[in-house]
């Protein structure tokens, strides 16, 4: 009897997942979107100090205003107006490690090419849903351990040092990059995380009106759902930057987690309506685990539940477009969320 019950439940779940995948599977083969990808890491490294003026001119011509953003804002130097900038960088204590990392980046060339093809396909999907959205120039860089993703109005920059696959090299990374951060530095995440950065800052930025935990969960869930729409063939684990084991924990504990989120405190307030930033962070901030739950809990469980809310909302409202979904307030998602699904 138990065996047949399992099969009975499994089939609808498969059908639901299939329907969701079908909805997001669109034909973008006729799209004219093409990405302009530039390699700042290759243009800069190794630093050649034999002709500084020529190197400065090359970097300015090839990367335009972003060169100034990179050197002055990201690396906190005097920029390319100062002829001592590059020699000073070459003499920094961290420079040998930067070059070791660059060797690791160069060994990932095939994966980088594939990820750029995937990212281009993602922007074709973005253009389908949001024709007015800007398609940025892509700059691939060795960020000297500063930024994994960085955006301006016209540039999406990817710090390849945050996606290196060589675990031996990563063991030597600066101590401010914790183990849980290095665990998620996978080349498989380049396209997805780059698009997440663009969606988060340029397409669906946070408004500042998000006051409760529920607001933040739904906001983040919407962006992850957007990611699924941009990359309909990607696994949920990749979309969330989870291992398969971490994702399995989410599904196994989904109902128990929801009970925690809806638990009422002594002030007669459910956890999802919490407004303290410190408490909200315990559910949605990156970390080794979701600190609001336990050290065994997959991190960012609030965000993952937000994705399930967005999925359920779109599943139950098939006439709603993705842009329209983004405009809905967080409470509307509660009506359709089913943690038992």
Question: Positions of the model-derived regions?
Answer:
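Sec-dependent N-terminal signal peptides
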Residues: 4-13
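C-terminal motif of bacterial Sec signal peptides marking the signal peptidase cleavage site
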Residues: 15-18
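N-terminal mature-domain "stem" immediately C-terminal to a signal peptide or N-terminal signal-anchor/transmembrane
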Residues: 20-88
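Sec-exported extracytoplasmic/periplasmic mature domains
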Residues: 45, 75, 127-131, 227-235, ...
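Acidic/His-rich structured neighborhood in mature extracellular/periplasmic domains
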Residues: 87-247, 322-326, 330
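Acidic/His/Gly-enriched intrinsically disordered linker/tail segments
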Residues: 222-290
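C-terminal soluble interaction/assembly domains
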Residues: 268-341
């Amino acid at each position: 009897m138990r065996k047949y019950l399992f099969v009975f439940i499994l089939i609808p779940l498969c059908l639901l997942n299939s329907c969701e995948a079908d909805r997001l599977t669109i034909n973008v083969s006729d799209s004219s979107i093409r990405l302009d990808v530039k390699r700042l890491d290759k243009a800069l490294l190794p630093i050649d100090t034999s002709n500084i003026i020529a190197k400065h001119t090359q970097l300015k011509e090839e990367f335009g205003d972003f060169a100034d953003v990179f050197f002055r804002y990201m690396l906190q130097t005097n920029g390319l107006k100062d002829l001592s900038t590059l020699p000073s960088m070459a003499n920094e204590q961290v420079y040998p490690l930067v070059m070791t990392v660059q060797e690791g980046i160069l060994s990932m060339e095939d994966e980088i090419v594939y990820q750029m093809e995937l990212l281009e396909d993602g922007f074709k999907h973005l253009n389908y849903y949001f024709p007015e959205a800007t398609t940025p120039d892509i700059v691939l860089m060795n960020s000297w351990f500063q930024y994994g993703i960085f955006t301006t109005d016209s540039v999406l920059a990817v710090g390849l040092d945050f996606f290196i696959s060589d675990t031996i090299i990563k063991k030597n990374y600066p101590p401010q990059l914790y183990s849980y951060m290095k665990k998620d530095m996978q080349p498989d995440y380049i396209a997805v995380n780059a698009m997440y950065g663009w969606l988060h800052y340029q397409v669906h930025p946070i408004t500042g009106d998000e006051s409760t935990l529920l607001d933040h969960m739904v906001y983040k869930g919407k962006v992850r759902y957007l990611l699924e729409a941009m990359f309909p063939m990607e696994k949920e684990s990749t979309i969330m930057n989870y291992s398969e084991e971490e994702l399995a924990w989410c599904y196994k504990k989904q109902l128990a987690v929801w009970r925690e989120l809806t638990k009422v405190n002594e002030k007669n307030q459910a956890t999802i309506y919490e407004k303290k930033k410190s408490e909200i962070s315990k559910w949605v901030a990156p970390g080794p685990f979701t600190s609001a739950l336990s050290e065994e809990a997959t991190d960012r469980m609030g965000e993952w539940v937000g994705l399930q809310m967005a999925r359920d909302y779109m599943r139950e409202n098939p006439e709603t477009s993705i842009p329209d979904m983004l405009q809905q307030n967080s409470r509307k998602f509660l009506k359709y969320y089913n943690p038992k699904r």
